[in-house]
Curated annotation (Swiss-Prot):
GO terms for biological process: alanyl-tRNA aminoacylation; negative regulation of DNA-templated transcription. The lineage of its organism: Bacteria, Pseudomonadati, Pseudomonadota, Gammaproteobacteria, Enterobacterales. It comes from Pectobacterium atrosepticum (strain SCRI 1043 / ATCC BAA-672). Pfam families: DHHA1, tRNA-synt_2c, tRNA_SAD. Its EC number is 6.1.1.7. This is Alanine--tRNA ligase. It catalyses: tRNA(Ala) + L-alanine + ATP = L-alanyl-tRNA(Ala) + AMP + diphosphate. It is an enzyme of class 6 (ligase). Belongs to the class-II aminoacyl-tRNA synthetase family. NCBIfam families: alaS. Binds 1 zinc ion per subunit. Consists of three domains; the N-terminal catalytic domain, the editing domain and the C-terminal C-Ala domain. The editing domain removes incorrectly charged amino acids, while the C-Ala domain, along with tRNA(Ala), serves as a bridge to cooperatively bring together the editing and aminoacylation centers thus stimulating deacylation of misacylated tRNAs. Catalyzes the attachment of alanine to tRNA(Ala) in a two-step reaction: alanine is first activated by ATP to form Ala-AMP and then transferred to the acceptor end of tRNA(Ala). Also edits incorrectly charged Ser-tRNA(Ala) and Gly-tRNA(Ala) via its editing domain. Homotetramer. The gene is alaS. Its main location: cytoplasm.
């Protein structure tokens, strides 16, 4: 009996754990250490800084099952998903890693043992083929002479991508940095499947399938292209869980493995179909995995960046559900079966289940409101299409008006043998939106300008002053030996009391000084393991190895500490009031206020906001001790400490406890007792995305000042109403009632005026071919009354065409009315549009009533004068 996907995942991790590897949890799909990356798309992403030498771990061997998404950006598999056997938006990457420990011999030996040993995967050795980089004689020799793979099944792959080291078998992190050859292992499905071995003209067939890639990082590529040997070569491997499961379960398509068969059955049940061969089922089964895990990791549907990629995937799934006959929201119903089939890999998703389901349902229902209309428009455009390509302007209109991502439009077109002019779509988007929605905010890693090998000890938990030594200086991203007055720079010290921005807490400000030298620290940032003091030298000359007094702005730090501690109290209070589904989605803590984003699907009620505020202030009055303990990460979790999912934590973590009320993992600076916070006030509560709410609040003196401002405003209002703050509500209600009564009276007077105006105007109508025509400009008439006047005039005149215009505050208002007996010849919408374009405007409406506006008041008389000839031509 073949292993299940869950058993294969666990077997991989167990094997490498038995070889001395640390089992590391999957990191978030949102990379927290690489702003150039849209989504985590490989197992090595969370170890990038380790490979670059910017981060150190307590272990030198690691193994993971990493959740990955490839949709959008460089790795965009979206259009192929569901139509091929192996393309996915979401997949799991099994990997083992060596950070300067073992290298090629052990990496290859481990891979062969796991794949072929009867105790593990027990694959037939004769079914396995291997590729190596053309000049990697070492790897070739290990496979041939030590492992015993026949040389005819070891294929050398050279530079097949147009340049030196540009090869399927040479891996590079970027244009510079760690790189090296790789060896790939392929499984031969047999002669009954079309395709040739790797490197052959028929290699794209499905017979030989790559199942494992072993990367040997042994070089450091320089700017000039030279390859320098790394002092400690490393290993990074990746094996797609879905691919190896297909091999071990003896099926040729990933969609036939147990995991996908379960999901496809769930999709069929949700949409009410029995045809399990329909490719739309595969599309939806894939998409629920990426969408659910992305939302669980904090991404919400939006029109920007990651949120827009998520929206595209959800809407593609919704459209395929529509094709299968789904009439109601169904996608969210797949979260529960997904959690069940993913098993231990879905623990975090299970905690967020209700939030994920609600976000999916809201997005699907929102799209459903425009899906049918958009598809009808697309059908109409395709019917009238000349050629085989839909123009970019139409694709953009579908996106802009009906929310159709361009790849969804491309899907529909492809099903009918058509293409989409995607370049034209991008041009239309740029011209009409003036911004690119799918890439903004990514692509520039400013921290990469500064590479610091040092580790800066932080001593700022205990003090805000420290004598230290300058160990590095950076000016314009380059290391320098000295800086002069006026230079902006980053200063690295051998130790510092300055807190580097992280965990939502802003970096410290202050001063570095010695005799005749002053460096104003405007911000503090982390550069790998180093803490950088960002600012400007205002006096003297600062050199590497100089001693300085590092002085944090302690008053500013104190305000930040209070706000940060209040954030923890707020988090715990929200979970009490709203439920344990509340999880932190982001935060900002500075010296003025705190901002806290959290998972919740609806706006908080005023009484809930008050309840949260009261709970936090009650904990402040309890004056709880704020205690910090350093312990193993597993011990902290066992103690119940809340962690921010996706955040990277060391093996030992700081656990912050506030009495019996709050316990969280946190590396920030805090009050010593909750009473130090003094006062907590919520300033605002709002939504930032589907399923994410935001609270802004303030503490201490800032909160007191906010209360004083509110009190002052109430006193000012009371004086204006000639009352006091005690009866202010009654006074305001009385004023509003009086205002509404006067407004009603005014509208009645205006209606009477309009009726009188209509009576006087009816006598000014002329006649064309038996039809009354009334065209006139009115002065000092409320534009809102024009519609009433037109209705009155139509009743008075009988068969008639009416155009009224008025100008007020530099704007033209136009209205056209046509009695129903004439709308087959004269349409009010066309008529008012004809007039509006002459006054710099546009408008439209029904055939019998239409309105428009314009900006050229001076052109109004001439525009109205042109109406008679236009109407005459129609009659």
């Amino acid at each position: 009996m073949s292993k299940s996907t869950a058993e294969i995942r666990q077997a991989f991790l167990d094997f490498f754990h038995s070889k001395g590897h640390q089992v590391v949890d999957s990191s978030s799909l949102v990379p927290n250490n690489d702003p150039t990356l849209l989504f985590t798309n490989a197992g090595m992403n969370q170890f990038k800084d380790v490979f670059l030498g910017l981060d150190k771990r307590s272990y030198v061997r690691a193994t993971t099952s990493q959740r990955c998404v490839r949709a959008g950006g460089k790795h965009n598999d979206l259009e192929n998903v569901g139509y091929t056997a192996r393309h996915h938006t979401f997949f799991e990457m099994l990997g083992n890693f060596s950070f300067g420990d073992y290298f090629k011999h052990d990496a290859i030996r481990y891979a062969w043992e796991l794949l072929t040993s009867p105790q593990w995967f027990n694959l037939p050795k004769e079914k396995l083929w291997v590729t190596v980089y053309a000049t990697d004689d070492e790897a070739y020799g290990i496979w041939a002479d030590e492992v015993g793979v026949p040389r005819e099944r070891i294929i050398r792959i050279g530079d097949n991508k147009g340049g030196p080291y540009a090869s399927d078998n040479f891996w590079q992190m970027g244009e510079t940095g760690p790189c090296g050859p790789c060896t790939e292992i392929f499984f031969d499905h047999g002669e009954h499947i079309a395709g040739g071995p790797p490197g052959s003209p028929d290699e794209d067939g499905d017979r030989y399938i790559e199942i494992w890639n072993l990367v040997f990082m042994q070089f450091n590529r320089q700017v000039d292209g030279t390859m320098l040997p790394l002092p400690k070569p490393s290993v990074d491997t990746g094996m797609g869980l879905e691919r190896v499961s297909a091999v071990l379960q003896h099926v040729n398509s990933n969609y036939d493995i147990d995991l996908f068969k379960t999901l496809i059955d769930a999709v069929a049940k949700a949409v009410g179909t029995t045809d399990l061969t329909n490719k739309s089922l595969r599309v939806i089964a894939d998409h629920i995995r990426s969408c659910a895990f992305l939302i669980s990791d904090g991404v919400m549907p939006s029109n920007e960046n990651r949120g827009y990629v998520l929206r595209r995937i959800i809407r593609r799934a919704a459209r395929h559900g529509n094709m299968l006959g789904a009439t109601d929201a169904f996608f969210y119903k797949l979260v529960a079966p997904l959690i069940e089939v993913m098993g231990p890999a879905a623990e975090e998703l299970k905690k967020q289940q209700s939030v994920v389901e609600q976000a999916l349902k809201m997005e699907e229902e929102q799209f459903a409101r425009t899906l049918e209309r958009g598809l009808s428009l697309l059908d109409e455009e395709i019917k009238n299409l000349k050629g085989d390509t839909l123009d970019g302007e139409t694709a953009f209109r579908l996106y802009d008006t009906y929310g159709f991502p361009v790849d969804l439009t491309a899907d529909v077109c492809r099903e009918r043998g058509l293409k989409v002019d995607e370049e034209g779509f991008e041009a239309a988007m740029t011209a009409q939106r003036q911004r690119a929605r799918d890439a903004s905010g990514f692509g520039v890693d400013y921290n990469s300008l500064i590479r610091v090998d040092e580790n800066t000890p932080f001593c700022g938990y205990e003090k805000t002053q420290q004598q230290a030594k300058v160990i590095a200086l950076y000016h314009n991203g380059n290391a320098v030996d000295q800086i002069a007055a006026g230079d902006e720079a980053v200063v690295i010290l051998n130790e510092t009391p300055f807190y580097g921005e992280s965990g939502g807490q802003v970096g410290d400000q202050g001063e570095l000084k010695n005799a005749g030298v002053s460096f104003a620290v405007q911000d503090t940032q982390k550069y790998g393991q180093a803490i950088g003091h960002v600012g400007k030298l205002t006096q003297g000359m600062l050199r590497v190895n100089d001693s300085v007094d590092a002085n944090v702005d302690s008053q500013r730090r104190d305000r930040i500490r209070l706000n940060h501690s209040a954030t923890h109290l707020l988090h715990a209070a929200l979970r009490q009031v709203l439920g344990v589904h509340v999880a932190q989605k982001g935060s900002l803590v500075n010296d003025s206020y705190l901002r806290f984003d959290f998972s919740h699907t609806e706006a908080m009620k005023p009484e809930q906001i008050r309840q949260v505020e009261d709970i936090v202030n009650a904990q402040i009055r309890r004056n709880l001790t704020v205690q910090t303990d350093v312990m193993a990460l597993d011990d902290a979790r066992a103690k119940g400490a809340m962690a921010l999912f996706g955040e990277k934590y060391d093996d030992h973590v700081r656990v912050l406890s506030m009495g019996d009320f709050s316990i969280e993992l946190c590396g920030g600076t805090h009050a010593s007792r909750t009473g130090d916070i003094g006062l907590f006030q919520i300033i605002s509560e709002s939504g930032t995305a589907a399923g994410v709410r935001r609270i802004e609040a303030t503490t201490g003196e800032n909160a007191l000042s906010a209360l004083h401002r509110q009190s002052d405003v109430l006193q000012d209002i009371a004086q204006l109403l000639k009352g006091d703050s005690h009866n202010l509500t009654d006074k305001v209600r009385s004023v509003l009632d009086r205002s509404r009564a006067l407004e009603k009276e005014l509208q009645q007077l205006k209606a009477q005026q309009a009726a009188q105006e209509s009576s006087s105007l009816s006598g000014k109508a002329t006649e064309i071919n038996g039809v009354k025509l009334l065209v006139t400009q009115l002065d000092n008439v409320d534009p809102k009354l024009l519609r009433t006047m037109v209705d009155d005039l139509k009743n008075q005149l009988g068969s008639a065409v009416i155009v009224l215009g008025t100008a007020a505050e530099g704007r033209v208002s136009l209205i056209s009315g046509v009695t129903k007996d004439l709308t087959d010849r004269v349409k009010a919408g066309e008529l008012v549009g004809f007039v509006a374009q002459q006054v710099g405007g546009k408008g439209g409406g029904r055939p019998d009533m239409a309105q428009a506006g314009g900006s050229d008041v001076s052109a109004l008389p001439a525009a109205l004068a042109s109406v008679e000839s236009w109407v005459a031509a129609k009659l």
